[in-house]
């Protein structure tokens, strides 16, 4: 069963390794082509932000994260977090910390994993 939500999927990938960023981009392209899921990539030198602005299913979200975890270690820091009435995003940790939204901006903070 797939669960659909109107909103945006956001995955922030922290890396300065161009070869890894290229692999991440290929993973997003694969998702776009196979699942008709719109996902744009913005490169800010140390991060790749993937925004999916179409309705999406958790199945597709899981597939995207499976692809990413095959590229580098990604561990879940929280489950699905709802932001606002119609906006959702998944939050994941990278290199011992996590990104969170605070006052409309992404903030990086330490995060221990049990």
What are these regions (language model features)?
Residues 1-29:
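Short, extreme N-terminal segment that most often corresponds to the first beta-strand
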Residues 27-114:
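Charged interaction segments
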């Amino acid at each position: 069963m797939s669960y659909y939500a109107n909103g945006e999927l956001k995955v922030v990938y922290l890396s300065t390794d161009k070869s890894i960023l290229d692999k991440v981009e290929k993973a997003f392209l694969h998702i776009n082509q196979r699942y008709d899921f719109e996902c744009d990539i913005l490169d800010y030198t140390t991060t790749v932000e993937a925004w999916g602005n179409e309705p999406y299913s958790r199945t597709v979200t899981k597939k995207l994260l499976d692809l990413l975890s095959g590229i580098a270690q990604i561990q879940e820091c929280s489950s699905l977090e709802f932001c606002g009435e119609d906006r959702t995003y998944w939050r994941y940790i990278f290199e011992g910390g996590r990104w969170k939204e605070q006052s409309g901006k992404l903030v990086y903070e330490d995060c221990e994993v049990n």
